[in-house]
From Swiss-Prot:
Keywords: Transport, Viral movement protein, Virion. One of its GO terms (cellular component) is virion component. The keyword Transport applies. Movement protein that is involved in local cell-cell movement via plamodesmata. At least five viral proteins, CP, CPm, p6, p64 and Hsp70h are essential for cell-cell movement. Also plays a role in virion formation. Together with Hsp70h and CPm, encapsidates the 5'-terminal portion of the viral genome. The lineage of its organism: Viruses, Riboviria, Orthornavirae, Kitrinoviricota, Alsuviricetes. This is 64 kDa protein. It is found in: Virion.
Length: 553
């Protein structure tokens, strides 16, 4: 009874070669088989369960399919050599290949190497060592003797080097020869595999996968430009290309998100760059570039986890609540930006240490603020105050990055959101070195709390702040909203005086008070003195003083 052939479930390209040849050699053998154009298997093939793979099916096989790999296995000369060595017909050896689930998929078997396949066990070797060593059996000597004896096929004294040489080198001339011995090298086999892999990737059937690999590897080429390797394209050096394709094949290295790209590049730096340096004696003519600058950070990555957005008013549904996009920014997004910003700070300020770079960053945006747009551009350089060392930090690259990011994300104040996410770090610096900023509201913020006069107050992380700090930030937020409302009312009044219809086409002033602030709680009574100081001579309504806003996180 015959059955129509169907591809086995869970089959993947290379599985047949791995199952037949096993070990670590199957990849090299498969590359060798695929690198040469071979005729398809020209007969029908019957599997042991009655399934027939027709000659026509072999002829029509393409791509990375079961039939094409099976055809390669059938026509590969080394398959026949292995079967001949084992004394079995090739058709008989391969007739169960369509039943993949019947075989153990693991390449490794856990065995006791001290007993399985050994002519001499540890016990017998221990007794032998005692006889030749004055009834003393040191563990290291026993281990050495056990290895030598099982290698040579007889119990051998580890100190008897002449006997060992005579057993290994059968001829006297060879045993006494001083010529350099030539041995096979898995190192050379690997390089040969890389050359075969380069040829395989250049086959038309692999053009799609090759283009995906090349999309990532062009960044490797950019990285190597500062070296003397002179590698600008795969055709410049097929061996280098093969090594890089091996990395892509082994670690599924494709161009992805910003952080994933950096992670993949770390694999190249730790595993494959040392290999290239050893094979080609590569040297650096100029310092290697910062990996973080090789890849662009796409604005779309920052909002990958945001649910569907209403493009009309930039709102979306999040945890059963309607929220503005401005109020939502993933911690993952902040981490992406932080990695990119630090790379730009490092590039533009190579003489500054990590701590100096970020102290300068926080002070810069404390002084120049974080508004989306400005009539006067922020200074490219900023000199820090004496308490912080009076060093100069170059912020031009960071500003260009934020400008481009802001254009692509107009609904979000990128600088403000990002600085708010790092507020705990910034406030720690400001408090330690006594850094403060001019007020941004009418409030009388005490001098010791002047570091809270930042314009990203709405996005400050509330965790870890004192009760006084929470009170000040909440009242700053309220007073800014109050001033915006008063300014809008005054503007509309002037329009009315000019005979224009006030509020014409106006949909209302955007409520600057955050959703967190609206769900406020009454501040403890021991903060009354601070509230009186904040609102003294400001003219705010009494009910606001008695029930100030306080955000919870």
């Amino acid at each position: 009874m015959t059955t129509r052939f169907s591809t086995p479930a869970n089959y993947y390209w290379g599985e047949l070669f791995r199952r037949f040849f096993g070990g670590q050699e199957w990849k090299n053998l498969m590359s060798e088989a695929a690198s040469v154009s071979r005729p398809r298997y020209s007969s029908d093939f019957r599997f042991s369960d009655g399934v027939i793979l027709s000659r026509k099916t072999f002829g029509e096989s393409t791509g990375e399919s079961f039939v094409r790999e099976f055809s390669l296995l059938l026509t590969f000369p080394k398959t026949y050599e292995v079967c001949k060595l084992c004394g079995v017909a090739m058709e008989l050896a391969l007739n169960g290949m369509n039943r993949l689930s019947d075989y153990n998929v693991s390449e490794f078997n856990i065995v006791d190497v001290k007993t399985v396949g050994c002519k001499f066990n540890i016990q017998s070797v221990t007794e032998f060592v005692k006889k030749i060593n004055g009834n003393v059996a040191e563990p290291s000597l026993v281990e050495h003797c056990w290895s030598l004896s099982n290698s040579c096929g007889e119990l051998i004294n580890p100190k008897d080097t002449k006997r060992f040489v005579s057993l290994i080198f059968k001829g006297k001339d060879l045993a006494e020869s001083t010529d350099e011995a030539i041995v096979s090298s898995s190192y050379l086999d690997y390089l040969s595999h890389c050359l075969n892999l380069y040829e395989t990737c250049n086959l038309s059937s692999n053009s799609g996968k090759k283009s995906l690999y090349d999309e990532f590897l062009k960044h490797v080429i950019d990285y190597l430009e500062n070296s003397d390797l002179e590698y600008r394209s795969p055709s410049d050096n097929p061996l280098v290309a093969g090594i890089l394709y091996d990395m892509c094949f082994e670690y599924n290295t494709l161009k992805s998100t910003y952080l994933k790209n950096i992670e993949s590049f770390d694999c190249f730096l730790s595993l494959y760059l040392p290999l290239l340096s050893e094979v080609f004696s590569m040297n650096w003519e100029r310092p290697a570039p910062d990996v973080r600058l090789l890849f662009e950070l796409d604005a779309a990555e920052l909002l990958l986890k945001v649910p569907t957005i209403n493009m009309h008013d930039s709102t979306f549904l999040y945890k059963n609540k309607l929220r503005y996009l401005e109020s939502y920014f993933e911690d993952d997004s902040n981490e992406l930006i932080k990695v990119k910003v630090d790379s730009l700070l490092t590039r533009d300020n190579p003489e500054l240490k990590l701590a100096q770079r970020w102290v300068g960053f926080h002070c810069y945006y404390g002084v120049f603020r974080t508004a989306q747009t400005r009539k006067v551009k922020r200074d490219a350089e900023y000199k820090l105050p004496p308490a912080l060392g009076e060093f100069v930090i170059n912020m031009s690259g960071v500003e260009e990055f934020f400008e481009e990011l802001q254009k692509k994300m107009p609904s979000i104040s990128v600088r403000r959101r990002f600085c708010g996410s790092l507020s705990h770090e910034a406030f720690s610096v400001f408090k330690r070195f006594g850094v403060g900023f001019p007020p941004i509201t009418r409030l009388n913020v005490p001098v010791k709390y002047s570091y809270l006069n930042v314009d990203y107050y709405r996005h400050v992380k509330r965790v870890g702040l004192t009760q006084d700090e929470l009170t000040i930030l909440s009242n700053i937020e309220f007073d800014v909203a109050e001033m915006c409302c008063e300014r809008e009312v005054a503007l509309q009044a002037r329009r009315a005086q000019r005979g224009e219809k006030p509020f014409q086409g106006w949909k209302g002033t955007k409520n600057e008070i955050s959703p967190h602030a609206r769900s406020s709680i009454r501040v403890k009574k021991n903060n009354d003195s601070l509230l009186n100081i904040l609102w003294k001579d400001v003219g705010a309504r009494s009910q606001r003083r008695l029930n100030p806003l306080h955000r919870k996180h």
